[in-house]
C-alpha cells in the first residue's frame, strides 16, 4: 500500500534523527563544525546504495550527469570513508567494501596475468565493476590500503562473520600479492621491487609505501587468522 506524505516525512525524519544522534562534534568554530556535519550529510545521502558515491560531486554533479575523470581513483576515493567509523556510521562503509570485495576475482586474475603472481592486485584507477585501468600497473600499494580498510571495519564492529567471510579473504589475497613484491638480495634483506609511489610516475626501488604497507599488512594478516 502507498504511504501518505506525512508518513514518508515521519520515517525520513526518524532516519536522519538516528544519524545525528550517533555522534557530534564541537570544534569551537562554526565553520569547522559545519564542515563536519555537511560531510556526514553527504555520506548518509550518497553511500547507502549498491555502489559507493564517488569522491568528486557524489550525487551533486553541477553539470547534469557529467562527472570528471569517470573512474574511482583510490587516492581520492578512500578519504570519503576514513572518518565514518569513528563517527559511528559503519554501515556507510559497506557499499565501498562490497564494491572492493566483489572485484576480488578480477583482481586475482590481474595478479596472475600482469605479474605472474599469486594474490590479488588492485591499483589506483578502477571502473564501476572495480576492474583495474591498464595504465597504473606499477602502482602496487592500493590493494594493501584497501585491505586495511576491511580490517578497520572489523575493529570497529567486532563482526566475526564479516571478518571470516569478507575481511580475511581480502586481506590474505592482498598479503599474498605483496609477498611477491619482496625479493631477498645478497645483503640478506628483503627489498621491494620497483613501483611508483602514490600518484607519481617515477619507479622507485624499496619505495616507502611498499615497505611500510608490507610490514603492516603481514602483521594484520597474522593477527586476523
Whereabouts are the PLM-identified features?
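Carboxylate/His-rich catalytic cores and anion/metal-binding grooves
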Residues: 36, 43, 74-118
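Extended, well-ordered alpha-helical scaffold segments
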Residues: 31, 35-38, 92-103, 162-178, ...
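Sec-exported extracytoplasmic/periplasmic mature domains
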Residues: 21, 40-47, 85, 101-105, ...
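The feature captures the catalytic groove of carbohydrate-active enzymes
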Residues: 55-70, 117-165, 169, 173-225
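Acidic/polar, glycine-enriched structural segments that form the non-catalytic walls/loops
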Residues: 1-70, 90, 102-109
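Short, solvent-exposed loop/turn and secondary-structure capping segments
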Residues: 44-55, 83, 93-96, 181-184
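Solvent-exposed, acidic/flexible segments
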Residues: 9, 25-32, 36, 73, ...
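Alpha-helical support elements that line or immediately flank enzyme active sites
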Residues: 42-45, 77-93, 144-160, 164
Amino acid at each position: 500500500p502507498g504511504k501518505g506524505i506525512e508518513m514518508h516525512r515521519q520515517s525520513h525524519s526518524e532516519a536522519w534523527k538516528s544519524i545525528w544522534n550517533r555522534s557530534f562534534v564541537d570544534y569551537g568554530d562554526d565553520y569547522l563544525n559545519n564542515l563536519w556535519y555537511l560531510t556526514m550529510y553527504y555520506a548518509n545521502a550518497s553511500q547507502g546504495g549498491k555502489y559507493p558515491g564517488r569522491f568528486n560531486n557524489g550525487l551533486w554533479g553541477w553539470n547534469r550527469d557529467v562527472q570528471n575523470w569517470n573512474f574511482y581513483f583510490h587516492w581520492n576515493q578512500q578519504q570519503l570513508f576514513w572518518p565514518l567509523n569513528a563517527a559511528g556510521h559503519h554501515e556507510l562503509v559497506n557499499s565501498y567494501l562490497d564494491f572492493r570485495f566483489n572485484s576480488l576475482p578480477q583482481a586475482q586474475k590481474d595478479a596472475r596475468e600482469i605479474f605472474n603472481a599469486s594474490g590479488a592486485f588492485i591499483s589506483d584507477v578502477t571502473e564501476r565493476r572495480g576492474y583495474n585501468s591498464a595504465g597504473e600497473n606499477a602502482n602496487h600499494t592500493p590493494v594493501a590500503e584497501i585491505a586495511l580498510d576491511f580490517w578497520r571495519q572489523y575493529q570497529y564492529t567486532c563482526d566475526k562473520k564479516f571478518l571470516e567471510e569478507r575481511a580475511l579473504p581480502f586481506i590474505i589475497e592482498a598479503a599474498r600479492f605483496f609477498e611477491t613484491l619482496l625479493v631477498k638480495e645478497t645483503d640478506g634483506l628483503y627489498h621491494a621491487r620497483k613501483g611508483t609511489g602514490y600518484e607519481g610516475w617515477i619507479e622507485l626501488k624499496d619505495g616507502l609505501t611498499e615497505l611500510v604497507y608490507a610490514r603492516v599488512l603481514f602483521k594484520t594478516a597474522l593477527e586476523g587468522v
